[in-house]
Amino acid sequence: MVSTTSLQPALRLLVGLLFFSTWFATADVTAQAYPSARSGGNYMHAFYLPPAPTATPWAPAWAPDGQSVAVSMQGSIWEVEVETGVALQLTSGRGYHSSPNFSPDGRWLVYTSDFDNKRIQLEVMNIETGEVFRLTDDDQIYLDPVFSPDGKQIAYVSTQPSGYFNIYIRNFFDGSWVAPPVAVTSDNDFGRSRLYFGAWDMHITPTWVPDGSELLLVSNRDVPLGSGNVLRVPAIENGIEFAETVLSEQSLYRTRPDVSIDGKRFVYSSTSGSADQYNNLYVQPTVGGEPYKMTFFESDAFHPRWSPDGENIAFIGNSEGLSRLMMLETYGGKITHVSINELRHREPMGMVSVKILNSDDNQLTPNRVHLKASDGKFYAPLDAYARAGHVGDLVFHNDGEFEVQVPVGDMEFSVLKGFEFHPMTKSVNVIENEVIHLEVKLERLINMGKRGWHNASTHVHANYGGNLHNTLDNLKFMSRAEGQDLVLEQVANKDNRILDYHLFEGGGGAHSSSEEDQVVVVGQEYRPPFYGHVFMFGMKDHLISPFVTGYEGTAVESLYPSNTDMLLKAKAQGAVTGYVHPFLGEIDPLEGSLGGGKGFVVDAALGATDALEWSDASTSGFYPLYAVWNSGLRITATGGEDSISSLHRSKLIGSFRTYVYTGSAGLSMEAWFDGLLKGRALVTSGPILEMAVGSSLPGDTIEFSDDRGTLNISGRLRSIVDV
C-alpha cells in the first residue's frame, strides 16, 4: 500500500507510525485461567497448582506397602515400583490427573482432575476394580486431597464458597462423601493487599499427624510476605482459631510439609526463608524448633513424602532439567534416582515419529509443537521440556524431530517456528503398536534477517523457582525453535531470592555462550514494586544491588534509592535500560496512579531510561509513550513477553518481541542495541509491518524547511495468521 499525505514537522515520525500500526495488528489472545479463584493469580498457578503438561513424574505418594509410589505423569496417575522402575497406569480418561493419595488400606486412590485450566475436581478410584467416582463436579478448584490415618476422612483445599483457598475435612465411605464438609479454616482479610498475594489469606497443603487429631498446613494468615508459615491446627471446625505456628519463614507455595510416622518431625521443601536460590529438603520438630537441612542441591527438591516405614523420603528433583522421582535415605543420606524403565498403559497405544524441515534448505529445524491425541489430551516425548502457555496451550519444543507415544485414533498436531514461517497442522490415525512416520516442511513467510532486521524478546528469564531447571543452552534451544536471533536473559529477584545471578559475566559484551548466528546477553531486571521494573543490559562490571526496594518487612523496605539512582548507576557501566511491562489495560495511566511504571516519565526526561516495553496487547502504554515523544524525548518502544521458562505455566518465549534494523552491521550485540537506541525498532506479537517514509527508516528525523511538506509513506504487512 502507498499513500501520500501532508504532515507537520515531527521528531522521529517513523517511530510512532511504525509502532502504532504494528501494535494494532496484533491479536489480543487472553483467557482467564481458573476463574473461580479470587486470589493467587499467575504465581499460584505456576508454583502451586498441579502441572497439566508434565511428561515426567510429579506429586509422589507412597502405597501403604512401601513397595511403590504413585505419581502424576502424562496427565494420568501411575504407580511406580521402586525396585524395578516399572510404571503401571492407574487412571485414564477426561481431565489431567495429579496429587494422588492412597487410603491407608490401599483400597482407594484420591486425586485431582484438571479440566482445561478452568476447574480442578476430586475423583477417587477403587484400586481393585478400577472404578472411578467423582467426589466433586462443579466450577470450583479442589486441591491437595489426603486421607486421614484411619481412612475415614479426606482433608482437602477448596475455593468454596467465595473463591478463596480454605481447608476442609469430609467423611468418606465406599467411594463417596457421607457427611457435609467441615471447614477447618475460613475466609480472612489481612486488611490490605499484599505484594503478589492480595488481601485474602490462603490455607493450603494439609497433612495429618499420625493420631488424626491435627493437621499441619501452610497459611499466610497475619503474614505480609510469602505464601505462609507452617501451622499446627486441630482437625475440627474452625480449627484455625487454635493454630500454632511451628515454622515461620518466607515461602513460595513449595513447603508441602509431611509428618513422620512417629509424629515428632516433618519434612518440607524450602529456600531457607529465601536465602537460597534453590529449594532443598529440611526436617523440623512438629512442635516447632530449628530446621535441619537434608539436601544440598544446586537445583530443586520438591514435594517430599515419608515412606510408610520412615526409612526413605520420596521427592521430586529437577537437577537434569525435567522433574524426576528421587529417593533420599532418611538415615544414611543416600540419594537415588528411581528410573522409570517401562510404561504399562491402560489403553492401546501407538507411536508417531515426526521430522520437521526448513523449506530454505530442507534441513531439520527446531520448532514448537501443539498436540492433541484421540482422548483430547496433550502428550509429549518423555525427554521434552513440556510447558503451558499463559492462555493454556500445552506445548513442547524439539530440535527438528521427535517421537511421541499416544492413544490409538486420530491425533492432530501443529508445528510453529516464530513469526517468519507459516504454521503447519497435520492429522494422523494412530494404530496400536505401530510407528507412523511423518515429515513436515515449514514454508517461510519472510526472511527479516536478510532484510537487515534481527529479533529478540527483551524480557526473558531462565529460572524463577519453577518446576523445571533451566539452562542457557536450553534457553538458546527454545529461542532457536521460536526463530529468535538474540537471547536476552535477565537475572532477577523473586522476593528475597536472586535467580540466575551466576550466569552474569562482566565486560559489557555478549555472553561467552553466544554463537555466530545466535547472540546471548545476560542482563538484569531490577524490580522495585513502587517505581516499576526495568531492564539493564550491557553492564561492564557488576549487577546492580539491592535488586529491589520497598519490600515490606525487609531491610530494603525503604523507597530510597529511586529508579533514577539505580538506572544511572547501570548506565555508568554502559547499560541500555528500559521500563518493562509497566502499563497494563486500556486506561491512560497519566490520569491516575501512573500504573506499574511510576518512574518512567521522569526517568525518560532525565535520560535514565532508553526504552518502554510491551509484554501484552494492552493500549495504556501509548499515553505515556506519546507524551514523551511529543516532548521530544527519544524513547524506543520494545517488545518482551516476560517469559519464565522454568515455570510450567508462563508466557512462551518470544511471544512478544522486538525487531531491530542493523543493516550492513549484521547480527551482534553491539549493532542490535545501537539500532535500538537509534529507534530503528518495531514491536510485534506476530504480524510484521515494514514501513518507510521516502528513504527514511524508523528512528530517522524528518525536517521541513517550511511549515508543511509532502511525504510518501509506504508499508507492507505480513502475518502467519489473519489480522
Task: State where each predicted segment sits.
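Beta-strand-rich domains and repeat architectures in extracellular enzymes and scaffolds
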Residues: 44-78
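C-terminal functional module detector
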Residues: 358-377, 385-386, 395-401, 410, ...
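Beta-strand-rich domain onsets/edges
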Residues: 334-351, 359-360
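A flexible loop/linker signature enriched in serine peptidases of the S9 family
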Residues: 53-54, 72-78, 92-97, 110-124, ...
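Short coil/turn segments that connect the beta-strands within blades of beta-propeller domains
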Residues: 65-67, 105-107, 150-152, 211-213, ...
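Bacterial N-terminal signal peptides
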Residues: 13-25
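Catalytic cores of extracellular degradative/oxidative enzymes
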Residues: 451-637, 641-648
